[in-house]
Amino acid sequence: MTPGTLVLLHDPADTAAGWGPLPETLRSYGLDVVAPDVRGVEGMRYVARAALVIAATAPTAPLVLVGHGAVGPLLPSIAVAQRAAHRPVGGYVFLDARLPQARRAPQIADPAQGHGHGHGGRTAPEVPVPEDWPEAPCGYLQLSTAYDQEARQAGLRGWPVATAEQPDVAQAMHKLIVTL
């Protein structure tokens, strides 16, 4: 695929600086790249802030959302916000990232364990995965063996999976995006 803007979304515990030279290297391949800094929030607050920051960059559709680490499960919700703003998502790349999981029924905390928190006994809600997800092709780029299970799951989902080591991450990501 030929992306409009490649949006690099860092792990909620990190900052955009964690991408290092990757954005600039991807630009050298002729890609339009934004790496928004979404600090100090997680879950749906990360989704909301990312949507605002992405909008401020005036990206070109179709977007390719690249998620790292714990932001992986948030990509479907971030995509919903982009589609609502008439910025279609053309693909997803999970870079050493956790994967979105199917919806599950809410968990009821065991009051004997002290997890009721005074909110009806429910645990904190997970970020929902839209029923129509994925509406665009997905790929997985593995850098670390710590993500062997996620890479395996991505392959079982029929997604292209690539591996890379520094300094070849940009080249591997570019090749993966072309296959989407």
Model region roles, listed by residue range:
Residues D37, G69, S144:
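Nucleotide-sugar donor-binding loop of glycosyltransferases
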Residues A50-H119:
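Serine-dependent carboxylesterase/thioesterase catalytic core
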